[in-house]
C-alpha cells in the first residue's frame, strides 16, 4: 500500500510464494517483495551475473534501496550466499531457511539425486574429476561476508533429512561466528526440510527490519543498554538463567511460555534455567 522509507526490498531467487509468511509480513511493513527465478542455476557464475544485472535494474529503474535483503530457501541458499560474497557492499542482511551450503551434502554425489547432481555439474561447467576444487560452496566463501559483518538469520529443522543441518547451516554458523560475524539461528526441534519458515514470522521480520539503513535513526526511543552480555553468555558459555518478574507474567500462560520456547529455539545449544518469580 505504501513503501517504507528508503524503498527496502527482499529478494527471493527461488521458490517464490512457498511458505511466504515472512514475505507477506514484510509487504505489510512497506517492503518490496521481489522475485527473479534462478532456482536451477545452483549459485553459478552465470546465475550471479544475471542476478547482478537484475539488481542494478531494481536499483536504477525502480529506485529500490542499494542494500538488499537476500532470502534463500533450500537450494536458493547457494545463490544468496554466493551473490552476497561477491557483493557484500550491496547487502543489508541475509535470511536463509534450510539452505544448501555444501553441494556435497545436497544434491550430493551419492544421495539418489543423480539428475540434480549432473545438472549442477553442467551448470558450473565442471566434471567429477574437478569437483574436489569446487569454488562455489557457501561454507567456504564466508570471509567476505564476515569482513563486512553482514547479519545472517537462519531457520532450520534439526531433523532435516534432505539438507541436513549438521552438514550445512551448523558448519556455516560455527565458521561465521568464529570470524566474529553476526549469525542468529532458529532451530526447530523435530522438523524435517518442510515446512519452511515459522508459523509466527515475527522474529525473522524484526531481524530484517532492524538491519535496514536508517532504522535506528527512525526510532522514537533510546535504549539505555543492550543484551550483548546475555547474548555472549548464551553463545559462548551456553548456560543462562532467565527470571520472570510479576504476577501476571509468572502465573498466566502466554508470553512467558512463548519467550521460553523462543530462547530455546534461538540458542539450541544453551542450557536454560527459567525462574517464575512472581511478586
Feature-to-residue mapping (PLM):
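C-terminal catalytic histidine-bearing segment of alpha/beta-hydrolase fold enzymes
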Residues: 162, 166-216
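Alpha/beta-hydrolase active-site loop
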Residues: 42-63, 82
Amino acid at each position: 500500500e505504501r513503501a517504507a522509507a528508503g524503498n527496502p526490498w527482499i529478494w527471493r531467487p527461488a521458490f517464490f510464494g512457498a511458505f511466504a509468511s515472512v514475505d507477506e509480513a514484510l509487504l505489510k511493513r512497506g517492503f518490496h517483495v521481489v522475485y527473479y527465478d534462478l532456482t536451477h542455476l545452483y549459485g553459478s557464475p552465470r546465475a550471479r551475473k544475471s542476478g547482478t544485472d537484475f539488481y542494478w535494474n531494481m536499483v536504477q529503474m525502480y529506485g529500490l534501496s542499494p542494500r538488499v535483503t537476500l532470502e534463500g530457501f533450500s537450494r536458493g541458499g547457494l545463490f544468496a550466499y554466493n551473490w552476497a560474497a561477491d557483493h557484500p557492499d550491496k547487502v543489508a542482511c541475509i535470511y536463509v531457511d534450510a539452505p544448501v551450503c555444501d553441494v556435497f551434502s545436497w544434491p550430493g554425489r551419492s544421495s539418489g539425486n543423480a539428475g540434480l547432481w549432473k545438472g549442477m555439474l553442467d551448470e558450473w561447467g565442471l566434471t567429477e574429476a574437478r569437483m574436489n576444487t569446487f569454488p562455489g560452496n557457501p561454507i567456504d566463501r564466508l570471509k567476505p561476508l564476515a569482513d563486512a559483518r553482514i547479519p545472517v538469520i537462519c531457520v532450520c529443522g534439526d531433523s532435516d533429512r534432505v539438507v541436513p543441518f549438521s552438514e550445512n547451516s551448523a558448519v556455516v554458523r560455527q565458521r561465521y561466528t568464529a570470524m566474529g560475524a553476526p549469525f542468529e539461528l532458529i532451530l526447530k526441534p523435530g522438523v524435517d526440510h518442510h515446512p519452511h519458515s515459522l508459523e509466527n514470522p515475527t522474529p525473522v521480520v524484526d531481524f530484517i527490519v532492524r538491519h535496514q539503513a536508517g532504522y535506528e535513526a527512525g526510532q522514537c526511543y533510546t535504549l539505555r543498554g543492550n543484551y550483548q552480555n546475555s547474548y555472549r553468555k548464551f553463545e559462548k558459555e551456553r548456560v543462562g538463567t532467565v527470571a520472570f518478574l510479576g504476577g501476571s507474567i509468572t502465573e498466566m500462560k502466554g508470553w512467558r511460555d512463548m519467550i521460553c520456547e523462543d530462547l530455546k529455539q534461538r540458542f539450541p545449544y544453551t542450557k536454560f534455567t527459567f525462574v517464575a518469580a512472581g511478586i
